[in-house]
Amino acid sequence: NSTDAAALVRPGCALDREAARRGTSVYLPEETLPMLPPELSERRLSLLAGQDRPAVSVFVSLADDGSVRRCSLQLSTIRVTRRLSYQDVDAQINSGGVFQRLHAVLMRSRETRLAAGASGISIPELQVRLSRDRRVVLSVRERETPAQALVAECMILANHSAALFLRDNGVPALYRTQKPGSLRAAHRRADLPLAERVRLRHAFNRTIVETRPRVHAGLGLDCYCSITSPLRKYLDLVMQRQLTAALQARGPVYSCEQLRDIAGALQPVLTRAALVENERRRYWLFKTMEPLRGQVMPALVLSRRKKHYTVLLRDYLLEASADPPDDGAYEPGRDVQVLLRSIDPFEGVISLSIV
């Protein structure tokens, strides 16, 4: 289920215009800048326990092998009886019951996508946030938990189901597409060495938003769109409007040309939002590392260039250039020690050398 934001945020209203201007919620270490006002995103439209909420529901019947037997999409009213944390669901998956069975079936569905060419590469992620007393808190997510994997597969399944519905009913839509790359199956495994996984991350073709339903190679699906985050992504809100109109047997809210115009206008907005997120995350990370100037830290060689190496600082999962040592040469995957010569949080500049 995803909350039916389209029921309250009408096309062209003041809320819609502001949401289009923002394009997305922006997540910074120090704060979140929501696309929609908190009164809506955190209260009136949030799936709070014990409250009736309009929703778009995707009903899917899965076989034991993870294949889809039946699927339907409906407008609904739902009431959450109990909100579960990821930790709650992890515990229930480990102890048996419905969540364990659901997780097992969804992991077979994931295996089917992987066999169709989806990427299984997972890279540790450094999370940077500020505590209430303005301390920088760093944490590393090594890999997704069973609960996170379950939720991810549910979202992919819901979005794929919506894309199939829109495509098969001839409804104008914005699809997320990705051309197949040149990676061999051996390069899509999750158990590759870290240096290889980081290097291959840059080898995938970029995802494109377009009105033609084409393959999304990175997910191993024949078509894909995104409808599950209408409170924080404007394109999801737009697509939810198209979907709800079709479910109500009304004409489409947007034509293909209008959708292309919306996607084109939104692209620089989303690019700028991603840049701000990356710059603020980098700033606070560099503030944490600033007292370490002149110290040596572990790194992993990713690649070698004519005049420098690209390394990954292991403790911070940060890719950066490093000057070569006075003698010797290192191949990708080699563990080395690097000297932090200088770092400037305001300019976002770091200087390293292999020692």
PLM feature spans:
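Short, compositionally biased
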Residues: 352-355
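Electropositive polyanion-binding surfaces
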Residues: 1-334, 342-350
